[in-house]
Curated annotation (Swiss-Prot):
Keywords, sorted A to Z: Chloroplast, Electron transport, Heme, Iron, Membrane, Metal-binding, Photosynthesis, Plastid, Thylakoid, Transmembrane, Transmembrane helix, Transport
Subunit structure of this chain's protein: The 4 large subunits of the cytochrome b6-f complex are cytochrome b6, subunit IV (17 kDa polypeptide, PetD), cytochrome f and the Rieske protein, while the 4 small subunits are PetG, PetL, PetM and PetN. The complex functions as a dimer.
UniProt protein name: Cytochrome b6
Similarity field: Belongs to the cytochrome b family. PetB subfamily.
Amino acid sequence: MSKVYDWFEERLEIQAIADDITSKYVPPHVNIFYCLGGITLTCFLVQVATGFAMTFYYRPTVTDAFASVQYIMTEANFGWLIRSVHRWSASMMVLMMILHVFRVYLTGGFKKPRELTWVTGVVLAVLTASFGVTGYSLPWDQIGYWAVKIVTGVPDAIPVIGSPLVELLRGSASVGQSTLTRFYSLHTFVLPLLTAVFMLMHFPMIRKQGISGPL
């Protein structure tokens, strides 16, 4: 095993990377409230894992969506547990994200030189809220349907571009299959991809600049 390790070490300098990760200075003022961002990340990873598992059974059609969710909850092995964990983790992710934003704001973590870290964090907060809006509709029950109808109807109040925006969100003039397809694509592909991209921007900046000092 040592020869295998030495082979990788010679090419990748694994030990230097490990030393950099484990020897990062942590300021003495850091407490449990500075862990809220990490908890949010953990919830996101749980969301990815449980959401991926449910894609094997979920059918994004207006005729089968609700029945497929019922199948997950009542017949699929551990489906009830996977979906329940997905829902609980979603609520926890939103809560931790809100608390994290408040903590950063109240401790001045948005100030120079961490402005870009703050901006990417705000974008991640918006993406997190978007996950909630799009995921809420996927069971396509009465609550999900009317929630989508209300949310997608909000832009209609905007002059000139309101109606085109509504049609863009819904895929047609009314809520239907095109709307569900759009929300499913956003929830399972577009939003996770954007979230991963902004996380890859957010975390290296935190790593580079370190944790902000006490007020």
